[in-house]
A protein has these predicted regions:
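Conserved hydrolase catalytic core segment
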Residues: 191-203
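Short beta-strand element of the alpha/beta-hydrolase
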Residues: 91-102
Length: 302
């Protein structure tokens, strides 16, 4: 006995069969798009040096103003490390950090990776290469004074403006992370009465690891400083003294934590990074602070 099936019913049966077969096949997850985290060599243009209030007053009175010595101003070499977090890259704009090294140009590799893994781009700049005549790890003299902090802070502000102009970076979420001597310069880059007041863009917050607290702490944004107990290069006592001295009305909060390094004094008396600098305690402290400041992404890989 033959059965006549209408063409439209046959099409419907075939469609249902294909759908059921598809459900029985193993589900394939689309392959994740690989993230290129290779550092990119960049050159950061130095911003025009701001005119001080004194120079403006002299000019307004018609008095001669001596030229500014810009011989040590130069473009700043750097490396940009993109964030590792896929989501942070795909939502359009991600936070970024300007990283300032110690006076010998060193910056902990672990911290570049940690910041990347939390969805932040990292711009590591090299002020030493921009100003080779300034030997920052050595002491200056009356004949040849060292003004490294000022130059480094200005380099950091130039790097901030460079990042603000980059595609994919949120201009309102650029922080500064200083290490050792670089942390001292970073503090000067957020000083309310310093260079930063002359420019439109400001850092969102500051992190200083093993900071040399030689700069003013009258900050316009919150900061977290983490020192090591008995650190011979960057004594925590300097930071305590600065914090007490610069406790002025309107200053943003400065948090200062001192951590036991667990190292003998001989190992601390070097410019090499110490294992405690990227320990779970310090990583948690920093990433929670950055998250509170609106910086950290959703990734928790470190």
């Amino acid at each position: 006995m033959s059965v006549n099936i209408r063409p439209e019913r046959l099409v419907a049966v075939l469609a249902i069969s294909v759908a059921v077969a598809g459900l029985l096949l193993p589900f394939k997850v689309p392959a994740a798009t690989p993230v290129d985290t290779t550092p990119q060599a960049v050159t950061i243009p130095s911003l025009p040096y701001p005119q001080s209030g004194l120079r403006k007053r002299l000019a307004s009175m018609g008095k001669p103003v001596p030229p500014v010595d810009e011989s040590l101003q130069d473009d700043i070499p750097g490396q940009y490390f993109p964030p590792q977090n896929d989501d942070a890259k795909n939502i359009g704009q991600h936070p970024a950090v300007v990283a300032l090294p110690d006076c010998d140009g060193s910056f902990p590799d672990d911290w570049v990776r940690i910041l990347q893994s939390h969805g932040m781009g990292v711009l590591l700049i090299s002020p030493n290469e921009a100003h080779p005549s300034q030997a920052y790890c050595s002491e200056g003299s009356l004949e040849a004074p060292k003004h490294g902090l000022t130059y480094w802070a200005f380099d950091a502000i130039s790097a901030l403006h460079y990042l603000v102009g980059m595609d994919g970076i949120d201009p309102e979420r650029v922080a500064i992370f200083g290490y050792g001597y670089g942390a001292g310069a970073a503090q000067l880059a957020i000083y309310r009465k310093g260079h930063a007041k002359h420019f439109d863009h400001h850092f969102r917050t500051l992190v200083g690891l093993r900071p040399q607290c030689m700069s003013e702490m009258d900050n316009f944004v919150p900061s977290l400083l983490i020192g090591l107990k008995d650190d011979p290069f960057n004594p925590p006592a300097w930071c305590h003294w600065r914090m007490d001295r610069d406790l002025l009305p309107g200053r943003s909060n400065v948090s200062f934590e001192v951590i036991e390094s667990g190292e003998i004094i001989e190992k601390q008396a070097t410019r090499r990074t110490l294992s405690v600098e990227s320990s779970a305690v310090i990583v948690t402290m920093v990433t929670e602070f950055l998250s509170k400041m609106g910086m950290a992404g959703d990734s928790t890989r470190n």
